[in-house]
Amino acid sequence: MGNSKSGALSKEILEELQLNTKFTEEELSSWYQSFLKECPSGRITRQEFQTIYSKFFPEADPKAYAQHVFRSFDANSDGTLDFKEYVIALHMTSAGKTNQKLEWAFSLYDVDGNGTISKNEVLEIVTAIFKMISPEDTKHLPEDENTPEKRAEKIWGFFGKKDDDKLTEKEFIEGTLANKEILRLIQFEPQKVKEKLKEKKL
């Protein structure tokens, strides 16, 4: 997307990222230098993205979730993210405005990219999320959502869908905005990602 490899971030991309995220010019410029050091080509691969995510969760297995996050931001499906896509991915998974976040969450759950979500797709993402929850934390989850299957069932039940029904983006966003319980169940906001962003160690 037109990222310069000379070591300076283009003014257009800088302005766009400042507009779409809460990051400052200094933060973005600093991350860009680090990004180029790690990825001299100016692009990050699925494997590299997975490795970065793994650093946040040394005691868990974030590979599956990281792959889904990567897929949802790889807009042109070329198997890489440029700096802009990478920063937006980190922003959306750690902060993000609710509506933007829900649009992203829909694309995360729409595993096959066909514009609707099935119950099986919900289970696939929830299973990936559970791999990042420590066994200790899992013990503290309510009885009706302490396994991926139970949580997927609970989410699907909130939307009032039959097992073989599909969920559109409009239904997903409206349903989630109307019910904070769904919002809590569908998202996973890694606190460690937020902490790393604050430390500017990405």
Curated annotation (Swiss-Prot):
<comment type="function">
    <text>Acts as a calcium sensor and regulates phototransduction of cone and rod photoreceptor cells. Modulates light sensitivity of cone photoreceptor in dark and dim conditions. In response to high Ca(2+) levels induced by low light levels, prolongs RHO/rhodopsin activation in rod photoreceptor cells by binding to and inhibiting GRK1-mediated phosphorylation of RHO/rhodopsin. Plays a role in scotopic vision/enhances vision in dim light by enhancing signal transfer between rod photoreceptors and rod bipolar cells.</text>
</comment>
<feature type="region of interest" description="Modulates EF-hand 3 domain calcium binding affinity">
    <location>
        <begin position="191"/>
        <end position="202"/>
    </location>
</feature>
<feature type="site" description="Interaction with GRK1">
    <location>
        <position position="192"/>
    </location>
</feature>
<dbReference type="GO" id="GO:0009966">
    <property type="term" value="P:regulation of signal transduction"/>
</dbReference>
<comment type="similarity">
    <text>Belongs to the recoverin family.</text>
</comment>
<keyword id="KW-0449">Lipoprotein</keyword>
<protein>
    <recommendedName>
        <fullName>Recoverin</fullName>
    </recommendedName>
</protein>
<feature type="domain" description="EF-hand 4">
    <location>
        <begin position="147"/>
        <end position="182"/>
    </location>
</feature>
<feature type="domain" description="EF-hand 1">
    <location>
        <begin position="24"/>
        <end position="59"/>
    </location>
</feature>
<keyword id="KW-0519">Myristate</keyword>
<feature type="domain" description="EF-hand 3">
    <location>
        <begin position="97"/>
        <end position="132"/>
    </location>
</feature>
<feature type="binding site">
    <location>
        <position position="112"/>
    </location>
    <ligand>
        <name>Ca(2+) 2</name>
    </ligand>
</feature>
<feature type="binding site">
    <location>
        <position position="85"/>
    </location>
    <ligand>
        <name>Ca(2+) 1</name>
    </ligand>
</feature>
<feature type="binding site">
    <location>
        <position position="80"/>
    </location>
    <ligand>
        <name>Ca(2+) 1</name>
    </ligand>
</feature>
<dbReference type="GO" id="GO:0043204">
    <property type="term" value="C:perikaryon"/>
</dbReference>
<feature type="domain" description="EF-hand 2">
    <location>
        <begin position="61"/>
        <end position="96"/>
    </location>
</feature>
<keyword id="KW-0558">Oxidation</keyword>
<feature type="binding site">
    <location>
        <position position="114"/>
    </location>
    <ligand>
        <name>Ca(2+) 2</name>
    </ligand>
</feature>
<feature type="binding site">
    <location>
        <position position="116"/>
    </location>
    <ligand>
        <name>Ca(2+) 2</name>
    </ligand>
</feature>
<dbReference type="GO" id="GO:0016020">
    <property type="term" value="C:membrane"/>
</dbReference>
<dbReference type="GO" id="GO:0001917">
    <property type="term" value="C:photoreceptor inner segment"/>
</dbReference>
<dbReference type="InterPro" id="IPR002048">
    <property type="entry name" value="EF_hand_dom"/>
</dbReference>
<dbReference type="InterPro" id="IPR028846">
    <property type="entry name" value="Recoverin"/>
</dbReference>
<dbReference type="InterPro" id="IPR018247">
    <property type="entry name" value="EF_Hand_1_Ca_BS"/>
</dbReference>
<dbReference type="GO" id="GO:0005829">
    <property type="term" value="C:cytosol"/>
</dbReference>
<keyword id="KW-0472">Membrane</keyword>
<dbReference type="InterPro" id="IPR011992">
    <property type="entry name" value="EF-hand-dom_pair"/>
</dbReference>
<keyword id="KW-0676">Redox-active center</keyword>
<feature type="modified residue" description="Cysteine sulfenic acid (-SOH)">
    <location>
        <position position="39"/>
    </location>
</feature>
<feature type="region of interest" description="Interaction with GRK1">
    <location>
        <begin position="189"/>
        <end position="192"/>
    </location>
</feature>
<dbReference type="GO" id="GO:0051924">
    <property type="term" value="P:regulation of calcium ion transport"/>
</dbReference>
<dbReference type="GO" id="GO:0007602">
    <property type="term" value="P:phototransduction"/>
</dbReference>
<keyword id="KW-0677">Repeat</keyword>
<feature type="binding site">
    <location>
        <position position="76"/>
    </location>
    <ligand>
        <name>Ca(2+) 1</name>
    </ligand>
</feature>
<keyword id="KW-0716">Sensory transduction</keyword>
<feature type="binding site">
    <location>
        <position position="110"/>
    </location>
    <ligand>
        <name>Ca(2+) 2</name>
    </ligand>
</feature>
<comment type="subunit">
    <text>Homodimer; disulfide-linked. Homodimerization is caused by prolonged intense illumination. May form a complex composed of RHO, GRK1 and RCVRN in a Ca(2+)-dependent manner; RCVRN prevents the interaction between GRK1 and RHO. Interacts (via C-terminus) with GRK1 (via N-terminus); the interaction is Ca(2+)-dependent.</text>
</comment>
<keyword id="KW-0106">Calcium</keyword>
<keyword id="KW-1015">Disulfide bond</keyword>
<feature type="binding site">
    <location>
        <position position="78"/>
    </location>
    <ligand>
        <name>Ca(2+) 1</name>
    </ligand>
</feature>
<keyword id="KW-0844">Vision</keyword>
<dbReference type="GO" id="GO:0005509">
    <property type="term" value="F:calcium ion binding"/>
</dbReference>
